């Protein structure tokens, strides 16, 4: 069957039984202005936009956050609240409950931070907190590492999608452990995996989509770019290109060269010299 780019439109991105038209999720913090954020969302048309209930100094905070929230609602993009800044299970649960009431959604991006320097998730307590939130009716998307055992444990407690990092939050380094990330994808073929944290360039996003990851979540890479709106658009294009490449079935890597032009049809003297060199 001939593959056409338009077939990506028939390749739904499904989370907890809901289909989304984009495989890009976009954070809403650290933009130069509310207008820039709004334009970036319009340029990238993400599946969801993430919002931290506990954020400090967020755009619109000077107006009590009301103007900011009204702007987000006007964008007509589903909101994914997160528990950024939470270091204990109780903080996460309290924040999630408040977010569900404020944003009127059962979706929650679970962030339980274990170290305030690396912002690495608390992998020991993360599964238990995820299980508690799921029992409370939340659709949990847990921020985690690429550790396969941890990811399996999160699935065991009821998570239907995972958000492993590529690198520590805000570093922009891309996938620092590509082997582990590719193994994770291979070992969990039926689990939606969204790369969260560490991506800095559109090429980073395209790469993980080429590996078979289902989506990416971005914030700093867009918000702190010299031209955030252009970067948002570039990431959206990279995500689509990466997914299209994955579906197209990339050629396997080889250790040795292999001529792309066949010997058949070449002048006989060239074919003879080629055979002699072989």
UniProtKB/Swiss-Prot annotation:
One of its GO terms (biological process) is thiamine diphosphate biosynthetic process. Pathway: Cofactor biosynthesis; thiamine diphosphate biosynthesis. InterPro entries: Aldolase_TIM (IPR013785), Thiazole_synthase_ThiG (IPR033983), ThiG (IPR008867). Coiled coil: none annotated. One of its GO terms (molecular function) is thiazole synthase activity. It is an enzyme of class 2 (transferase). 1-deoxy-D-xylulose 5-phosphate binds at residues 170, 197-198, 219-220. GO terms for cellular component: cytoplasm. It holds the Pfam family ThiG. Homotetramer. Forms heterodimers with either ThiH or ThiS. Belongs to the ThiG family. Catalyzes the rearrangement of 1-deoxy-D-xylulose 5-phosphate (DXP) to produce the thiazole phosphate moiety of thiamine. Sulfur is provided by the thiocarboxylate moiety of the carrier protein ThiS. In vitro, sulfur can be provided by H(2)S. This is Thiazole synthase. It comes from Cupriavidus necator (strain ATCC 17699 / DSM 428 / KCTC 22496 / NCIMB 10442 / H16 / Stanier 337).
